[in-house]
Curated annotation (Swiss-Prot):
Induction: Expressed late in the viral replication cycle. It comes from the Viruses. Interacts with glycoprotein (gH). This is Glycoprotein U47 homolog. Residues 287-313 have a biased composition (Low complexity). Glycans are attached at residues 40, 43, 127, 164, 179, 207, 227, 236, 259, 307, 310. It is found in: Virion. A long 51 kDa and a short 49 kDa protein are produced possibly by proteolytic cleavage. N-glycosylated with high-mannose and complex glycans. It comes from Human herpesvirus 7 (strain JI) (HHV-7). GO terms for cellular component: virion component. Belongs to the herpesviridae U47 family.
Length: 313
């Protein structure tokens, strides 16, 4: 009888501690606890040493610069799974030091998106674009005021794209992006638009930097131009050669690593502000002020390409 009472007491104590742990730590772990089965990042263990080194260096910088400190494991999951755009905790990354990525080497991430048919949709994404995608989605998806208020959307819209928006209209645009469901987000149109949106963030961060020399080298060779859609309208972006890994150099500026590839054009965001397609001609005038951001004739294009494969799921 005594042993039985002792066992019940121990069981009760363990149960109490366990549920206390859940109550205390569930809000903290919720950001990093979700596993997304429909997005597969391949060959992470096969990355070359230089890629792993820069990944770890960026991880360290990311953790130290983040407004809300996170663990390394949390960073990795946020990095790998941020495509879902469903972080449950407002994490503001507006103060992250993007200058560290000036000379970040190029390597490719490979994502597989299952479709309703027996085919997989493959996306090969440049790592730089992906890191900025993380920055963009975590900053804008949450719509946290402390993040959003640091970015002068009105100035960016009027100065870069010659479009005048009210604050309410801007909030509506990003609310539309926030309200995309997973099915909508990973549709052909929206996933492509998401990369175009990333490109806008890329340019925004690029224009906020004062490290002109190193960045000018990063964007040194610019060839061709193409129209891409952004929440602020359609504009021309030039294609940057960048620093590519050996496997990418075989394909030039394309991110495809397979045969019979097909480049698809971005489409406009549903319910976004409509405007006439606007050609963007960067100014050569340089200044550090946000009202007149530093301009350059070398401008990064959308770092994405997509194709369909007959590989069965």
């Amino acid at each position: 009888m005594k042993n039985k009472m002792y066992s019940m007491l121990v069981f009760t104590l363990i149960s109490f501690l366990f549920y206390s742990y859940l109550i205390i730590w569930t809000p903290v772990l919720s950001v990093c606890s979700e596993k997304i089965s429909f997005v597969n990042l391949t060959n992470f263990s096969m990355w070359p040493k230089f890629a792993k080194f820069h990944y770890e260096s960026f991880e360290k910088t990311y953790i130290q610069s983040c407004d809300i400190p996170i663990s390394k494991n949390c960073f990795k999951q946020i990095l790998f799974w941020s495509f879902r755009l469903s972080q449950k905790k407002n994490i503001c990354l507006s103060k992250i030091n993007m200058l560290y990525l000036d000379n970040f080497p190029r390597w490719t991430l490979h994502f597989e998106f299952p479709t309703k048919t027996n085919r997989k949709r493959h996306v090969y994404l440049d790592n730089i674009s992906f890191l900025y995608l993380v920055f963009a989605t975590l900053a804008f998806k949450t719509m946290d005021d402390s993040c959003v208020n640091k970015i002068p959307f009105e100035v960016l819209a009027s100065h870069l794209f010659k479009i005048n928006f009210s604050q309410n209209k801007i909030e509506t645009i990003f609310q539309d992006l926030q309200n995309h469901t997973e099915a909508q987000l990973f549709s052909r149109e929206n996933s492509e638009q998401l990369f175009s949106f990333t490109n806008f963030i890329y340019y925004f961060v690029y224009n906020r930097t004062d490290c002109k020399n190193s960045i000018s080298k990063f964007f040194y060779n610019s060839v061709n131009t193409r129209n891409v859609s952004t929440p602020f309208g359609v504009t021309n972006f030039s294609l940057v050669r960048g620093i590519m890994s050996p496997i990418q150099s075989f394909k030039g500026n394309l991110m495809f690593l397979e045969n019979k590839t097909k480049v698809t054009k971005p489409t406009a965001i549903p319910n976004a502000v409509t405007s006439e397609p606007t050609k963007f001609f960067p100014s050569t005038r340089g200044t550090s002020s946000m009202q007149a951001s530093q301009q350059t004739s070398s401008f990064p294009t959308t770092f994405f390409t997509t194709n369909h494969s007959n590989t069965s799921t």
